[in-house]
């Protein structure tokens, strides 16, 4: 695996125009060399690792993320998310992100992804908005998507 992927000037993105396809993954792809989502896999969980996750690190939600390096990015129309890490508190994780088609978030901007926990089945509650669901993006040499 390779990574992490970091954009050190993340603070300067506040209020800028969306990039790429305007989807969340497009932001991290534009500002880092993380590549296509097909090869993304989960690195360390972000929550609780604030001292070990650099500002500007590309982070995302992953399916099957219980084991590091075994998860994959779903790349679905909803229920997954990618962003650039800023910081964290006991309430959640601050990220810089973009959303295609969200009239309330027309530009790249920072926001708090609150810690929302997991459902009984182990899936994350509202993963696109849940700081608990974020892991550092790493890149695999082979596709991580199920066949």
Predicted feature descriptions by range:
Residues 3-15, 86-147:
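Aromatic- and glycine-rich peptidoglycan recognition patches
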Residues 1-82, 87-88:
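Secreted/periplasmic proteins that engage bacterial cell-wall peptidoglycan
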């Amino acid at each position: 695996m390779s990574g992490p992927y970091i954009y050190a000037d993340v603070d300067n993105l506040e209020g800028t125009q969306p990039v790429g396809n305007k989807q969340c993954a497009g932001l991290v792809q534009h500002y880092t060399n993380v590549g296509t989502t097909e090869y993304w896999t989960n690195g360390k969980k972000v929550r609780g690792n604030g001292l070990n996750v650099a500002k500007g690190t590309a982070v995302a939600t992953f399916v099957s993320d219980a084991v590091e390096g075994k998860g994959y990015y779903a790349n679905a129309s909803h229920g997954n998310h990618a962003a650039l890490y800023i910081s964290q508190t006991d309430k959640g994780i601050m990220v810089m992100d973009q959303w295609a088609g969200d009239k309330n978030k027309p530009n790249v901007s920072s926001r708090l992804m609150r810690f929302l926990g997991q459902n009984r089945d182990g899936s994350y509650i509202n993963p696109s908005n849940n700081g608990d669901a974020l892991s550092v993006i790493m890149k695999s040499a082979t596709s991580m998507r199920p066949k």
